[in-house]
Curated annotation (Swiss-Prot):
Gene3D superfamilies for the chain: 1.10.10.850, Phosphoenolpyruvate-binding domains (3.20.20.60)
Motif Microbody targeting signal in this chain: 548-550
Disulfide bonds, paired cysteine numbers: none
Annotated residues for binding of Mg(2+): D172
Catalysed reaction equations from the record: D-threo-isocitrate = glyoxylate + succinate; (2S,3R)-3-hydroxybutane-1,2,3-tricarboxylate = pyruvate + succinate
Species lineage: Eukaryota, Fungi, Dikarya, Ascomycota, Saccharomycotina
Native source species: Candida tropicalis
Keywords: Glyoxylate bypass, Glyoxysome, Lyase, Magnesium, Metal-binding, Peroxisome, Tricarboxylic acid cycle
Annotated protein name in UniProt: Isocitrate lyase
Gene: ICL1
Length: 550
């Protein structure tokens, strides 16, 4: 076998040079809040010899500076989920960032072409492919605009609005679509496809749900930290300044995969009746007897009533209140001062303290209360999300708590809780269409909600599915009118408003780049072509006259 000869001294010198470059990179202000648990040497060893500069990293830099400015000014980058190139081209005129929703991709753009609700069960490359779809459109419209402007005089350019089509894209990475290696590969896909940032949530991958569905199963705190570390490590290997958004679904979570992390112990539910027995064993025994359906559900309901399901601190407080103790309030305070949502007290430590205060071993068993699938019962909430947000902060650029309602007071509680420990932490907020906005607040409060959240530190806010909903509304409205009044529906409710509002897609040939392509044809054919798309006979000449006929 013929091996390639290599200069060992040069190889070592190149390695040391790269290590020095990485250390210098990490010393930049961009990384002042970022914690890494690996070394520059580790990253240099994982890189190949061919250096590839990804343009998405420039977009990451742009996004970071954008959010830095918003943070300083207490303002907000607010956006919504884009479905296609039409969306991003129109959004670019008014909004300074773009969101790509996994929910929307699941229903409209899976690479399997099979629609689905938001369960993240689509192929792993689905959202990265949508990012690339939109990123290529951004690049194309940017090229098209540049040529059009540079064909103008300076005076004409001065009077022609400039559109920044290259708005940074933040995309949905769900739970990472698997373990650590899957997350590393998924991150690489996003970097290659044009994402400036991605978000990842602390749900278990096999049971992932939309943030506004029931039955969410969390992973332990450290497991999600490992995911965030994997994202940063992958980005470091590929030389990217990718932003990472850590989402927690703990506010409404009801299950967790494991009790391994002591930071989760406060929120894990157990049985307080030693006579209740093991639920999973009871259910398995019933199924072995041929019991299913409503009867099986009844058995679970009866067990739940009997088990006395509680959090451990609730069991301790109930014992103190019901027992023969002097100065009960002082005992409760002594316990809750050391055992609370943000204390990170392990269950072992909490039990020891409870026995010191009550003289009893209070029965509490979280194993017998496990769900049939083996998951532990969990009672999240805002303070749980604060605990997780604080834990994730050193490894993420932004923190996002998924919530059930657009509740300003809850958003403030979360922001205040996180910032009490990490004062300069950036926050993100989902202005979800799953909320009933008109029921939640009056119109005047809706108008100021984004700004009010911005004052709390929510520098990036987004309506996940506005692209889906606005498209559905527009098409439903047009299809309805078209079915009744034919071409009048198009002429009067689509085309004429496009003309009056200056929506450039009315000249869809030009919008799609026909002039730009004609320029390419002329360039490679010596300046003359008889096959120009926008030559004599093009029907868009009709739009030089914009007055509608009545």
């Amino acid at each position: 076998m013929a091996y390639t000869k290599i200069d060992i001294n040069q190889e070592e010198a190149d390695f040391q040079k790269e290590v020095a470059e990485i250390k210098k990179w990490w010393s930049e202000p961009r990384w002042r809040k970022t914690k890494r648990i690996y070394s520059a040497e580790d990253i240099a060893k994982k890189r190949g010899t061919l250096k590839i500069a990804y343009p998405s990293s420039q977009q990451s830099d742009k996004l970071f500076k954008l959010l830095e400015k918003h943070d300083a000014e207490k303002s907000v980058s607010f956006t919504f989920g884009a479905l296609d190139p039409i969306h991003v081209a129109q959004m670019a005129k008014y909004l300074d960032s773009i969101y790509v929703s996994g929910w929307q991709c699941s229903s409209t753009a899976s690479t399997s072409n099979e629609p689905s609700p938001d369960l993240a069960d689509y192929p792993m490359d689905t959202v990265p492919n949508k990012v690339e779809h939109l990123w290529f459109a951004q690049l194309f419209h940017d090229r098209k605009q540049r040529e059009e402007r540079l064909n103008m005089t300076k005076e004409e350019r001065a009077n022609t609005p400039y559109i920044d089509f290259l708005r940074p894209i933040i995309a949905d990475a769900d739970t990472g679509h698997g373990g650590i290696t899957a997350i590393i590969k998924l991150t690489k896909l996003f970097i290659e496809r044009g994402a400036a940032g991605i978000h990842i949530e602390d749900q278990a991958p096999g049971t992932k749900k939309c943030g506004h569905m029931a039955g969410k199963v969390l992973v332990p705190v450290q497991e999600h930290i490992n995911r965030l570390v994997a994202i940063r490590a992958s980005a470091d290997i590929f030389g990217s300044n990718l932003l990472a958004v850590a989402r927690t679904d703990s506010e409404a979570a009801t299950l967790i995969t494991s009790t391994i992390d002591h930071r989760d112990h406060y929120f894990i539910i157990g049985a307080t009746n030693p006579e209740s027995g093991d639920l999973a064993a009871l259910m398995a025994e019933a199924e072995a007897k041929g019991i299913y359906g409503d009867e099986l559900a009844r058995i679970e309901t009866e067990w739940t009533k009997k088990a006395g399901l509680k959090l451990f601190h609730e069991a301790v407080i109930d014992e103190i209140k019901a027992g023969n103790y002097s100065n009960k309030e002082a005992l409760i305070k002594k316990f809750t001062d050391k055992v609370n949502p943000l204390s990170h007290t392990s269950h072992k430590e909490a039990k020891k303290l409870a026995k010191e205060l009550t003289g009893k071993d209070i029965y509490f068993n979280w194993d017998v209360a496990r769900a049939r699938e083996g998951y532990y019962r969990y009672q999240g909430g805002t303070q749980c999300a604060v605990m997780r947000g604080r834990a994730f902060a050193p490894y993420a650029d932004l923190i996002w708590m998924e919530s059930a309602l657009p509740d300003y007071n809850q958003a403030k509680e979360f922001a205040d809780g996180v910032k009490a420990a990490v004062p300069d932490q950036w926050l993100a907020y989902n202005l979800s269409p799953s909320f009933n906005w008109n029921k939640a607040m009056p119109a005047d409060e809706q108008e100021t909600y984004i700004k009010r959240l911005g004052q709390l530190g929510y520098v990036w806010q987004f309506i996940t599915l506005a692209g889906l909903h606005t498209t559905a509304l527009a098409v439903d409205d047009f299809a309805n009118q078209y079915s009744q009044i034919g071409m009048r529906a198009y002429g009067q409710t689509v085309q004429q408003p496009e003309i009056e509002k200056g929506v450039e897609v009315v000249k869809h040939q030009k919008w799609s780049g026909a002039n730009y392509i004609d320029g390419l044809l002329r360039m490679v054919s010596g300046g003359v072509t008889s096959t120009a798309a926008m030559g004599a006979g093009v029907t868009e000449d009709q739009f030089k006259e914009t007055k509608a006929k009545v």
